[in-house]
Amino acid sequence: MIEVVCNDRLGKKVRVKCNTDDTIGDLKKLIAAQTGTRWNKIVLKKWYTIFKDHVSLGDYEIHDGMNLELYYQ
């Protein structure tokens, strides 16, 4: 079980607990449950890498305590 921190730079910082074998789509659904936005409107980035929904967190090497950028489309 890892904890990922997502910051939208607008004052909202979300901490989500998930597993490394969860997909980015699963992570978006957990974030959407906490923020109240729709999961398909969320874009997760790290620097210039946009994370795709079907790839797992372990494949992207997302570890415990990692910060991700949260954008809305």
Curated annotation (Swiss-Prot):
Q: Which residues are in the Ubiquitin-like domain?
A: 1-73
- Give the induction text: Depleted by ER stress-induced mediated by the ubiquitin-independent proteasome system independent of transcriptional regulation and downstream of PERK activation.
Q: Does the keyword Iron-sulfur apply?
A: no
Name the major location.
cytoplasm
The GO molecular function terms of this record are: protein tag activity
Impact after mutating residue 22 to A: Does not impair binding to SART1 nor its pre-mRNA splicing function
The entry's localization annotation reads: Cytoplasm; Nucleus; Nucleus, Cajal body
Q: Which GO terms describe its biological process?
A: mRNA splicing, via spliceosome; positive regulation of protein targeting to mitochondrion; protein modification process
| InterPro entries reported in the protein's UniProt record | Hub1/Ubl5, Ubiquitin-like_dom, Ubiquitin-like_domsf
What GO terms fall under cellular component here? Cajal body; cytoplasm; nucleoplasm; nucleus
UniProt-listed CDD domains: Ubl_UBL5 (cd01791)
Q: Which domain of life is it from?
A: Eukaryota
- List the keywords (alphabetical): Cytoplasm, Nucleus, Ubl conjugation pathway
What tissues contain this protein?
A: Ubiquitous. Highest level of expression in heart, skeletal muscle, kidney, liver, iris and lymphoblasts.
Q: Name one Pfam family in it.
A: ubiquitin
- Record keywords: Cytoplasm included? yes
PANTHER family hit by this protein: UBIQUITIN-LIKE PROTEIN 5
Q: How does it assemble?
A: Interacts with CLK1, CLK3 and CLK4. Interacts with coilin/COIL. Interacts with spliceosome components SART1 and EFTUD2. Interacts with FANCI; this interaction promotes FANCI dimerization.
- Primary role: Ubiquitin-like protein that plays a role in cell proliferation and sister chromatid cohesion by associating with spliceosomal proteins. Participates thereby in pre-mRNA splicing by maintaining spliceosome integrity. Promotes the functional integrity of the Fanconi anemia DNA repair pathway by interacting with FANCI component and subsequently mediating the formation of FANCI homodimers. Also plays a protective role against ER stress-induced apoptosis.
What this protein is called in its record is Ubiquitin-like protein 5
The organism named in the record is Homo sapiens (Human)
Q: What gene, per UniProt, encodes this protein?
A: UBL5
